[in-house]
């Protein structure tokens, strides 16, 4: 009888679903092949409206699961909003779920229940936030105004300022975009706005690229914005790209180009408001708050990084300090994420770029795919945890993005045990240096492997 009911459900293509991504047109989502109209629920969502608007008009199966690890209540509540079934997919579909992730989530729930801890709050979170805001403001003042006449000292202080920008991004912005700081959506919203304000980069852009794109389709070419989809790129990191002679040297030049990341980000983030996509990932509709935050953030950036400092420094000196700070900021962030996903032992797959083709299915459960495309490093090092903002435990983060980085170390043994039980290899490097070397070796091998043969998407 249940199968008969399923046969007669109304069918919707992904393009039809994509039109329902605003409150005016209705908020539709698809989960596990079923379509839900959650327009009436949006104002009652404990996580706020904007999180659902970010997810609207698309398949959110894996986001839904990974952002509700502590309770099954949302799954039970959804049934009343069901309106039909998905007929076509926009992006790859993961194979049917194994028991791996459900077992893992159950163990994590037990851990927090026994320890009586809140997965989104700890006093350590408050201490870290106070520190990163203080460090950012103090390092800005000292690097721009404290030693005006000392060129070489200011060059060194520019590097210190880049560190404060990096820690601010990794400790505050990264957790806020994943709803991993407090249970209050207003906290996430305003913390995100301070990223626009203090860093001059769009929090809304990051949420679309990182949360909607990268976390769902990790290391899937033509879906994950972090590995690109253009035929010609400054590096080759997948076997689905054409190979050019310059790539033989990418292990030498690519790390330096990573230093341009922060500048590129600030120059390109406006596209989230104008182009409607980041790579192949459709972007959500921005609220007035997000647009205003973006505009004010850019103005504040120009005033505080250029106009005011120019009253104290020559243009040449100021640009020197600026590019030093931005170069090291770009390096810090880029390597923080690149070493976690681009290495020889990590999986890379691809999906079709042809709109008329059905996307290639991924031959793995989503959670297992996350483990096979990601590696951790320095799992017992508090220094690695602090200076990476928790991304040294990237496997933990991808499986439980809405849990605060404060608890990542506690979850590692749980994940290792469940991986052993299900015979899933957990990729761990002993140190950051080992992870860094694995990434450089990967760049070298991708550029110099004589047996390289471009794979087709269907391989």
From Swiss-Prot:
A motif (Histidine box-1) lies at residues 174-178. One of its GO terms (cellular component) is membrane. Keywords: Electron transport, Fatty acid biosynthesis, Fatty acid metabolism, Heme, Iron, Lipid biosynthesis, Lipid metabolism, Membrane, Metal-binding, Oxidoreductase, Transmembrane, Transmembrane helix, Transport. Its main location: membrane. A motif (Histidine box-3) lies at residues 394-398. A motif (Histidine box-2) lies at residues 210-215. The keyword Lipid biosynthesis applies. SMART domains: Cyt-b5. GO terms for biological process: lipid metabolic process; long-chain fatty acid biosynthetic process; unsaturated fatty acid biosynthetic process. The chain crosses the membrane at residues 121-141, 151-171, 187-207, 289-309, 315-335. It is a multi-pass membrane protein. It is found in: Membrane. The histidine box domains may contain the active site and/or be involved in metal ion binding. This is Probable Delta(5) fatty acid desaturase C. It comes from Dictyostelium discoideum.
